[in-house]
Every structure is written in C-alpha cells, then in structure tokens.
C-alpha cells in the first residue's frame, strides 16, 4: 500500500537534511498518515481509510458521506 492519503492525495516529497556544517543529504518527507475507521450512517457500517491528519479535518468539516462520494468518483474501492 502506498503512502498516499485517500482524501487529500498527499504523498511523500523529497528534500534535504541540512547539518550544522551545511552538508546536505537527501531525505523524504512523509505525510502524517493514520489508518482510521469512520462510521457511515447511511450505509450502517464502518469504512477504514488511510488518511492524513488534514484529511481527518476535511472529513470533520464536509462529512464522511461527501468525502466518500469524491473518493469513489476517483475510482477507489471503499
């Protein structure tokens, strides 16, 4: 399973670690992903999503039903 948020689409990005001596080494910045179960009242079941912390805030704001419509429209099986 890839490290991508199912709500926002955020994934890893690359950058540099920079030491005190200004030496640069490559690194990855990973999104803050969590596996979370959401209760979907209209379907009377739990849905398990891999979402970032920002994705959880979007679900709180818009509602799980509206977010699931967008996820399913993008072609993901949920």
Curated annotation (Swiss-Prot):
**Top-level taxon:** Bacteria
InterPro entries given in the database record: Ribosomal_bL28, Ribosomal_bL28/bL31-like_sf, Ribosomal_bL28_bact-type, Ribosomal_bL28_sf
Question: Segment Disordered: which positions?
Answer: 1-20
GO CC annotations on file: cytosolic large ribosomal subunit
Q: Which SUPFAM superfamilies match?
A: L28p-like (SSF143800)
Q: Give one Pfam family, short name only.
A: Ribosomal_L28
GO terms of molecular function: structural constituent of ribosome
Q: List the GO biological process terms.
A: translation
Provide this UniProt record's keywords sorted from A to Z.
Ribonucleoprotein, Ribosomal protein
Family of this protein: Belongs to the bacterial ribosomal protein bL28 family.
Record-linked NCBIfam families:
L28
Q: What is this protein called?
A: Large ribosomal subunit protein bL28
